[in-house]
Amino acid sequence: MVRGEIENNWLCFVVSYFYRYYWNKNYVIMKETCNLFFRGIHMITGEIKNKVDKIWENVWAAGLTNPLSVIEQITYLMFIRALDDQEINNIRSKTLLGEDVELIFPESDIGQAMRWSNFKFRNADEIYNIVSNFVFPAIKAMKHGKLPDFDEHGKLIPIPDTDETKDGFDFFAKHMATATFIVPTAQVLEKIITGLDDLYTHDIANLDMQGDLYEYMLSKLSTAGTNGQFRTPKHIREMMVRLLKPTPKDIICDPACGTAGFLVSAAEYVRANHSKKMDKNDWKHYESNMFSGFDTDTTMLRISAMNLMLHSIKYPQVDYKDSLSKQNDVYEAYTVCLANPPFKGSLNAATVHGDLRSITNNTKKTELLFLALFLRILKKGGTCACIVPDGVLFGSSKAHVALRKEIIENHHLRAIISMPSGVFKPYAGVSTAILIFTKTQAGGTDNVWFYDMKADGFSLDDKRQPIEANDIADIIDRFEHIDSESDRKRTEQSFLVPKQEIVDNGYDLSINKYKEIEYIPVEYPPTSEILANIKALNEQIMADTAELERLLNE
């Protein structure tokens, strides 16, 4: 038996079997215990990263140089392999447990040829033909957890619509309608499949490691999107999640989800801190309804769905939706909102929901409209941590002031964390801050906590190399003990500002408005001494000039 994925998955399967049939309890908990155990003894090593880089280089060498396109194509292949892995488990369940399990792949010759474990042994041209002409069209037409078959002429036979409950894989497949297969050559496809198969067979021990692997690939996205969105660094996401401390009972949303990084970080936090106490209903909620995301980029939706699936979210609730539009009718649905919404981009004001326009004085600025959206979609008592450009904090337009006033007067503004401008490099050098507030609809803002983050553990240039200086642990510790912050002076890195002072300053939330700087007095020499030094310097210049003229005249 190959060590790694097969061994670990088989062990989890066997343990789960005995747990289900001899103790008759929630086998999901035992499966989770297995996953957490294996997560503790495996990690993404430099060798694994080198293998990923090699796959990446092979694709780039063939002319596919857009990082997003590369990840998208690899995502499709990971999904294809995941289907075959699940099929192997289904067959085991039928054979060993006698369960009536629906199989994913058709039993025809073409259907079985579409399985990763079968086509990977063929030559490059045959693999390319099977994947491009059969597997890819099949996953785009997947329904009810099953792939369609093909007739003797190679024509796809659609699966009829029924009321059958959706399978977890359907939540990814539903975003495949506009997908295109653009791996350029048979040779490149063979190299990708061989490389991925090597990773899964020898290096990727479990689902958590697949998630870590995917995170590493996503870290290669080094450019901002056309709508002003860019990927939030993982350590910043994790800090924001730790500040909010989500629980298994929460319903979490990112209405501008991108690659679903915030949802993944929240999921990992819940598992790490609450898994031992979660019951069957908690796990069901965790796998299906706890995490929701919206985006208008279908490529991002496919990537985010895969990202969530690889982090144990069986039914990823990510949907195509313009969060700011009139078509988005979500109200008071979530208890936690985590987001880094786009700061710019095209916006058709006529399509913006009236509720958002009324709060923001008919603004077209997406960063303000998203803040209004967060207030609308949160349940009463729900909390938001979001990233905004500094302009939101001090902008003097009617829209800026109105929105800040709404949050401060009608809800509970808890914290402003000012981040250095290099946090989002190499995407952008924009200065940003984290806003933390709770929806109350009855006020509650008393003292607002400000923190001036100076370092996040990485250099603030384009290279973003690890450094020792890091304020994140201090931010979390001070926020958790915010009652002890009242004695801090305005010259310190964090301090509290009374609501009335903010109101008196036109609802300005920029930290520099309230931060005090200690100026160390500089002692200068007497004026007579300064003049004497200038005179001596002037005499020296004159002497040197005369000597230079003498040398030139010789």
Feature map (PLM): residue ranges:
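Short, contiguous acidic/charged loop-to-helix segments that flank catalytic cores in large enzymes
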Residues: 65, 348-365, 391-399, 420-427, ...
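Conserved Class I SAM-dependent methyltransferase catalytic core
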Residues: 70, 74, 296, 301, ...
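C-terminal, active-site-flanking charged/polar segments
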Residues: 412-413, 425-475
